[in-house]
């Protein structure tokens, strides 16, 4: 179990909250998280790259020039891979890059990744509570009050973010907003800081407890 200090939106301390998630053994955690990240990135690939082989290139029914007497290397077709515009040897064809991973392993990897970032977490009691309308500068100033630098990549985790918060964060290049029940290993590890709403911590423990 880990205890986090909670902050208010104005940056003042307001109390403490506990985060208790089962994690993988230290001997296997790195491999588990590595496989989870590989799976996530591989499954994002479209796999639609396609090239033409020698048999698929248009033309080439006749010999481009006679066999002897030209001083050039002999050629039997303009579709040969040796010529510009010819077929491609062992080029990519449409395929699936999807990798499988058991649900139990995926959830364990996510819990382990999240708990490994405890030192970079900021628990906020009332994230964006003062916003009455979408305003990017209010979010930037609020993150600064929490001790987060403009150059840092930030993952904001909220239970059910409002449209005002979504629109306010949308234009900030290094800040990403995600719902507490839609976490993924890559985003957790890719961020420099994690800002978590207090209600989101309860949601995380409810959804990912086992």
From Swiss-Prot:
Keyword hit for Phosphoprotein: no
GO biological process, one term: translation
Annotated GO MF terms: rRNA binding; structural constituent of ribosome
Record's keyword terms, sorted: Ribonucleoprotein, Ribosomal protein, RNA-binding, rRNA-binding
SUPFAM superfamilies the record matches: Ribosomal protein L4
Pfam families: Ribosomal_L4 (PF00573)
Annotated Gene Ontology cellular component terms: ribonucleoprotein complex; ribosome
Region listing for Disordered, in residue ranges: 46-85
Function: One of the primary rRNA binding proteins, this protein initially binds near the 5'-end of the 23S rRNA. It is important during the early stages of 50S assembly. It makes multiple contacts with different domains of the 23S rRNA in the assembled 50S subunit and ribosome.
Protein family: Belongs to the universal ribosomal protein uL4 family.
PANTHER family: 50S RIBOSOMAL PROTEIN L4 (PTHR10746), LARGE RIBOSOMAL SUBUNIT PROTEIN UL4C (PTHR10746:SF17)
Name of this protein: Large ribosomal subunit protein uL4
Organism: Prochlorococcus marinus (strain AS9601)
């Amino acid at each position: 179990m880990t205890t986090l200090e909670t902050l208010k939106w104005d940056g003042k301390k307001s109390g403490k909250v506990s985060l208790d998630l089962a994690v993988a053994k230290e001997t296997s955690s790195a491999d588990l998280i590595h496989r989870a990240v590989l799976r996530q990135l591989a499954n994002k690939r479209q796999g639609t790259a396609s090239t033409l082989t020698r048999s698929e290139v248009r033309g080439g029914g006749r010999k481009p020039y006679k066999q002897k007497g030209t001083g050039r290397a002999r050629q039997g077709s303009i579709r040969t891979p040796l010529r510009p515009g010819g077929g491609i040897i062992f080029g990519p064809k449409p395929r699936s890059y999807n990798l499988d991973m058991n649900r139990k392993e995926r959830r364990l990897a996510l819990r382990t990744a999240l708990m490994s970032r405890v030192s970079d977490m900021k628990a906020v009691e009332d994230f964006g509570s003062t916003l009455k309308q979408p305003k990017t500068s209010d979010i930037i100033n609020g993150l600064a009050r929490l001790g987060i630098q403009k150059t840092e990549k930030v993952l904001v985790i909220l239970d059910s973010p409002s449209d005002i918060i979504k629109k306010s964060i949308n234009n900030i290049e290094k800040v990403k907003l995600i719902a507490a029940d839609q976490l993924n290993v890559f985003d957790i590890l890719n961020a420099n800081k994690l800002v978590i709403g207090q209600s989101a911590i309860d949601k995380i423990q409810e959804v990912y407890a086992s």
